[in-house]
Regions:
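A short beta-strand-turn-helix
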Residues: 38-57
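Short loop/turn microsegments at loop-to-beta-strand junctions
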Residues: 35-36, 57, 141-143
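Short active-site neighborhood of thiol/selenol oxidoreductases, capturing the structured segment around
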Residues: 51-72
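Short, acidic, Ser/Thr-enriched surface-loop or helix-capping motifs
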Residues: 29, 42-43, 147-148
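Thiol-/selenol-based redox modules, centered on thioredoxin-like
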Residues: 139-181
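Structural microenvironment flanking redox-active thiols in thiol-disulfide oxidoreductases
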Residues: 72-112, 120-125
């Protein structure tokens, strides 16, 4: 009986705080908003700015941790769909709170052809409302922002299925660019 009560209290607690997190995120970033600028380094120490991608579509994806099952699956699908994304004029950039060294190892291991940026203090993820705190640990949420060539948010993905996310973005880019579903 006590275990059952604990279970219900835990579910209510998670539902309440999960909803608050969802509500804050969903009302904070809107399609059509200017994408928050960023200045972050990649694994080779090269600095990347949002403005570097002006004139192109940018798939800016936040992910929790290098070389974990879901993050690896997502990154490898982006890798495998790069030709399609590039044909649509899109660049892909991944961001997590991992170090540049961790990104370097992850990118080498899976032959990732796009930059992984180190947001070690979580400030960029926070500006996109894509940061969660587990007590003292900060982790990027699995969110993706499709940014149009003028720097506006064109699409926000907060419920990501890593097995088909990159193809979903390819399909959405085609619709955005042609207006045809």
């Amino acid at each position: 009986m006590m275990l059952k009560l604990f279970f219900y209290v835990a579910v209510l607690f998670l539902a309440f705080f999960g909803y608050r997190s969802y509500a804050a995120t969903s009302s904070s970033m809107q399609i059509g908003d200017d994408a928050p600028s960023f200045t972050l380094n990649d694994a080779q120490g090269q600095t990347h700015y949002l403005s570097d991608y002006a004139g192109k579509y940018l798939v800016l994806y936040f992910y929790p941790k290098d070389d974990t099952p879901g993050c690896t699956k997502e990154a490898c699908h982006f890798r495998d769909d790069m030709t399609q994304l590039e044909k649509l004029g899109a660049k892909v950039v991944g961001i997590s709170v991992d170090s540049s060294k961790s990104h370097e190892d992850f990118a080498k291991k899976y032959h990732l052809p796009f930059p992984l940026l180190a947001d070690t203090n979580g400030s960029v993820a926070e500006s996109y409302h894509a940061l969660t705190n587990f007590y003292v640990i900060k982790i990027a949420k699995r969110y993706t922002f499709l940014i149009n060539p003028t720097g506006k948010i064109a699409k926000i993905y907060t419920s990501v299925d890593t097995s088909n996310h990159s193809q979903q973005i390819v399909d959405d880019l085609k619709v955005i660019q042609t207006g045809v579903k």
